């Protein structure tokens, strides 16, 4: 709820993807959505600020990316995020797709080996280097977003013209651009520190220091946003 508060008062009708260790994709509603399709889609209606409802799906997200990078670091490959992104960008697209929520990745002590085994067992091309594995991870995360996005669109019977991508993932330009491409939707990325900033906004509002009408101005003055349009 805190993270969503950083964007929920921007009057665009856009949907929100909170992109961190976990992903939370959804929209702000006036009340809970209680349809059979929402139930079958494993949606949650969570209280949001100002008596609104977050209608969302939760999923494992950047944990696999961070764990992959950490394990490579343990092996002596000290890639920065930018370096790993460059390797992923240079690798061929569409090598393979994994399910980043699968137990074999959540419990893996060797993400690279687990990706190779998954690809081999599913009859897909096996990555031969770090760049290919990195691309598979990012493309698979984006595919997960796309599936969630399309399910949300089916339930809402509408699609937004804008997706707010907030949280740590907003710092990854490759992930943001590929998300815009896959969803065929403009992505507004940032703030990266949405949870902390949103919490501060809510506390200040509770103390009467600001109103919800001030949230957008505070966020705009505190954080720059990047816009990604579909290629």
Model-derived segments and spans:
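Catalytic-core signal marking the mid-to-C-terminal active-site face
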Residues: 200
């Amino acid at each position: 709820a805190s993270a969503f508060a950083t964007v929920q008062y921007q009057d665009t009708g856009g949907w929100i993807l909170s992109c961190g260790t976990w992903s939370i994709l959804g929209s702000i509603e006036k009340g809970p959505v209680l349809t059979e399709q929402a139930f079958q889609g494993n949606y949650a209606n969570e209280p949001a600020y100002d008596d609104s409802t977050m209608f969302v799906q939760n999923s494992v997200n950047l944990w696999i990316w961070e764990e992959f990078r950490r394990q490579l670091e343990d092996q002596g490959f000290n890639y920065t995020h930018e370096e790993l992104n460059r390797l992923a960008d240079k690798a061929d697209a569409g090598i393979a797709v994994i399910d980043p929520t699968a137990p074999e990745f959540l419990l893996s002590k060797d993400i690279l080996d687990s990706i190779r085994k998954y690809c081999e067992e599913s009859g897909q091309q096996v990555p031969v280097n770090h760049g290919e594995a990195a691309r598979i991870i990012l493309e698979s995360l984006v595919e997960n977003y796309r599936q969630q996005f399309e399910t949300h669109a089916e339930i809402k019977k509408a699609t937004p013209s804008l997706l707010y991508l907030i949280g740590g993932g907003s710092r990854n330009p490759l992930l943001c651009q590929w998300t815009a491409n896959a969803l065929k939707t403009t992505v507004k990325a940032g703030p990266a520190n949405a949870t902390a900033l949103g919490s501060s906004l809510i506390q200040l509002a509770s103390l009467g220091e600001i109103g919800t009408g001030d949230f957008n101005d505070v966020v705009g003055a505190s954080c720059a946003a990047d816009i990604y349009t579909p290629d």
